[in-house]
Regions:
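Active-site proximal loop and beta-alpha junction motif in alpha/beta enzyme cores
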Residues: 2-5, 165
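Pocket-forming structural segment of enzyme catalytic cores
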Residues: 65-81, 86-179, 186-187
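Charged phosphate-binding loop/patch that engages nucleotide di/tri-phosphates or the phosphate backbone
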Residues: 187-193
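Short, glycine- and charge-enriched coil/turn segments that flank and shape catalytic ligand pockets
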Residues: 3-4, 30, 38-39, 113-124, ...
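Flexible gly/pro-rich beta->alpha loop and the following alpha-helix that scaffold active-site loops
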Residues: 4-10, 14-81, 92, 186
Length: 193
């Protein structure tokens, strides 16, 4: 019997970081929350989730700790949530800026590109948003989903094992949030095995 998929949650100060950890545990992953200052060489995980958080990435990126190191040196899939996605996009040459319409609450997500992250899910469903900034251009990524007010709601990198979502799959209000995290865990397990 193989060991559970080990996915660590990098704490970027988000109010729902513990929910990511809890959902991952509920779906059978070996998960723990780690500080975003944890050195890469101390991380013994199959994958990372860069949690959301309060930093405005365009001028408060130092609050993201060693997340750039993780993107440069961690050898495994990474899922960026909210500010985690924004940092990932910026690091890969994209642009991040203030949202034309800041979002807080439910939004209708539309999947525009099939991918394992949304495997088995409907083409449209409601997700929980909480952001003032957003990815304006996602250089090096395929955009997987959009909403009425945000043209980059979910992405997958063209070459690296990077996934990102602007919304919060860990929040109860997000329909199919557990399935999205389960699908990410399946991608990680497939890569590991």
């Amino acid at each position: 019997m193989s060991r559970p998929t080990r996915i660590y949650v990098v704490d970027n100060g988000g109010q729902w970081t513990h929910r990511i950890w809890r959902v991952l545990g509920e779906i059978g992953c070996d998960s723990k929350i780690i500080a975003n200052t944890t050195p890469v060489e101390e991380i013994e995980a199959d994958a990372l989730v860069l949690s959301g958080g309060a930093p405005r990435i365009t001028w408060e990126s130092p609050k993201m700790g060693k997340c750039i190191d993780y993107l440069q040196q961690f050898d495994g899939p990474i899922l960026g949530i909210c500010v985690g996605l924004q940092l990932m996009a910026l690091h890969c040459g994209g642009k991040v800026g203030p949202s034309d319409v800041p979002e807080y609450g439910l939004a209708k997500l539309r999947i525009i590109e099939e991918d394992d992250l949304f495997k088995g899910l409907p083409r449209e469903f409601h997700v929980w948003e909480s952001h003032n900034d957003e990815v304006k251009s996602a250089k090096g990524f395929t955009v997987l989903a959009v909403s009425d007010n945000c043209s980059v709601q979910a992405v997958k990198h063209l070459e690296k094992q990077y996934y990102g979502v602007q919304f919060h799959p860990e929040v109860n209000n997000t329909e199919h949030g557990e399935e999205i995290l389960r699908n990410f865990a399946a991608v990680v397990k497939h890569r590991r095995d």
